[in-house]
Curated annotation (Swiss-Prot):
Highest taxon of source: Eukaryota
A Gene Ontology molecular function term of the record: ATP binding
Record keywords, A-Z: ATP-binding, Kinase, Nucleotide-binding, Transferase
CDD domains: GntK
InterPro entries: P-loop_NTPase (IPR027417), Shikimate/glucono_kinase (IPR031322), Therm_gnt_kin (IPR006001)
Record protein name field: Probable gluconokinase
Example GO biological process: carbohydrate metabolic process
Pfam families per record: SKI
Pathway given in the UniProt record: Carbohydrate acid metabolism; D-gluconate degradation
Reaction(s) catalysed by this chain's protein: D-gluconate + ATP = 6-phospho-D-gluconate + ADP + H(+)
Family: Belongs to the gluconokinase GntK/GntV family.
Top-level EC class as recorded in UniProt: transferase
Protein residues bound to ATP: 34-41
Length: 200
């Protein structure tokens, strides 16, 4: 093989690697976060449907033990949540590393109540590959929604425990990640439109 052939081959490899890196950098994970009753699943499904992309609800990653605790009205602790958050992070990284799926976006829901929880799910993920959407509303509205929710393992009596540990993003988090804050008193269509304004 001549030097010219080698140069052409090296250039092809370089271009291919750059293309793969650009594809990876263009991928975006949208995390719909907030306490139970804030509408994470409803909004997450609506966003994923509008984008035509994949969707994962954090409930999929809970162990049966975690679900039973919540069903019984027992709040989860940090140890309960650690493997759950690790599983979500693993799925996120799988999405980012899959260069053959043709998808640039993926929506996840996760309560992500504490700063440390958000650190766990965003571990080894580039800032520009991740957008946190925090759904916020009054305790009264959240409670009403939970009381009206059917066939879900989450005990409405756990709302107070979630609100008590909810940590708004710190200044450091706001510098290291992209955040959007959404008022859930608006309609689903209005919320989706507001989120799309952040995505532009």
């Amino acid at each position: 093989m001549t030097n010219l052939d080698n140069n052409n081959l090296n250039e092809e490899i370089k271009n291919k690697l750059e293309k793969q890196q650009n594809q990876k950098e263009q991928k975006l994970i949208i995390v719909i976060m907030g306490v139970s009753g804030s509408g994470k699943t409803t909004i997450g499904n609506a966003i994923a449907s509008s984008l035509g992309c994949g969707f994962n609800d954090a409930d999929e990653f809970h162990s049966e033990e975690n679900k039973e605790k919540m069903r019984s009205g027992i709040p989860l602790n940090d140890d309960d949540r650690k493997p759950w958050l690790s599983s979500i992070n693993k799925r996120m990284i799988e999405f980012l590393n899959n260069e053959n799926d043709g998808a640039n976006d993926h929506v996840f829901t996760c309560s992500a109540l504490k700063s440390t929880y958000r650190d766990q799910i965003s571990n080894n993920i580039n800032k520009d590959n991740l957008l946190f959407i925090l759904l916020q509303g009054s305790k009264q509205l959240l409670s009403e929604r939970l009381q009206n929710r059917k066939n879900h393992f989450f005990n409405p009596n756990l709302l107070d425990s979630q609100l008590s540990i909810l940590e708004l993003p710190t200044q450091s988090e706001l510098s290291n990640h992209h955040y959007a804050f959404i008022d859930i008193s608006n309609s689903v269509d209005e919320i989706v439109e507001e989120i799309f304004n952040y995505l532009k």
